[in-house]
Amino acid sequence: MDDRITPRGYLIDVDGVLRNGSQVIPGAVEALSWLRSAGIPFRLLTNNTISSRASLAAKLSDAGFPVTASDIFTAAFATASHVAQRFPGVPCYLLSTGDSAMDFHAAGVSLVGPDGSPEAGVVVIGGAEHELTYARLNHAYRLLLGGAKLIAMHRNVAWRTDEGMTLDSGPFIEAIAKAAGVRILTIGKPSAPFFRQAVRAISLPASSLAMVGDDARNDIAPAQRLGMTGILVRSGKPVSATDEERARVTLDSIADLPAWIQAKTQE
C-alpha cells in the first residue's frame, strides 16, 4: 500500500491488541467504538482457538467492545470450515482447550476422542494447553503414522496471559510433525488464505486495508505481503527494533489509532 493512502478498513488482532489475558488494554474499547461510530469497517482476525466465535464475541461484548460474532474470524472457525469442506465425513481428533469444538460441531465435523472408533483421519491441534498431555500427543502421533493429516489452527510460539508470556502450541506441533515425518497444514495466521477470508468478508480490496497487530511475524508481515498497511502495536508481545523497521506504522497501542487515522485524513 502507498503510505500516503489512508486505509478504508481495518483487520484487528485480539490478544495483545484489545486485551492481555483477561485485562482490557486501556483505550481499546474506545478505539473500536470510535471506528464503529465513524462508519469505518473492521473485522477481528485472531488466532484464538480457545473460544468459539459466539463465546468470544460474548466475552468481548461483556467487556464493552461493540462486536458481534459476525465481526470475528478465529483460527478455530476457519479450521472447522476447512475440515468440513476438504474432509467431509472424516473423523477428526481435536486437541484444543475451551469450547472451540462448538465451531466444529456447527460445521458438521465428526469429532472423536483418543478411544474413538473409527480412528480419526485428521488430527487438529489448537491452543491445547492442558490438553497437551503425553498420552494425547502420543495418540496423535500414532494417528499420523497411520496416515492421518495434521492440521494446525496456528503455530504460535508464545502469547501473553495474566501470568505473563506463556508457551503456545507451535513448538509441540513442530515436534510431533518431525517425529511422524509429516507436513503441517496451517490454517490461521500467518497463512494467506486466512487473511483473504477476512478481506472477502469486509468487502474491500486488500490494498485499502490495514492490519493492527502485536506480532510482526504472524500479523504484520503476511498482511503487508498482500498489500495492506501493517500497524504494529507495542501493547502485547515484545517488539524489537527490527520489528518496528519492518512495519509501516508503529503505535504504542490501539488507543492511538483514532488519532493516527485523523492525522492521515488531514494530510
What is the role of each PLM region?
Residues D2-I40, T49-F73, A80-E267:
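Asp-based, Mg2+/Mn2+-dependent phosphohydrolase catalytic module
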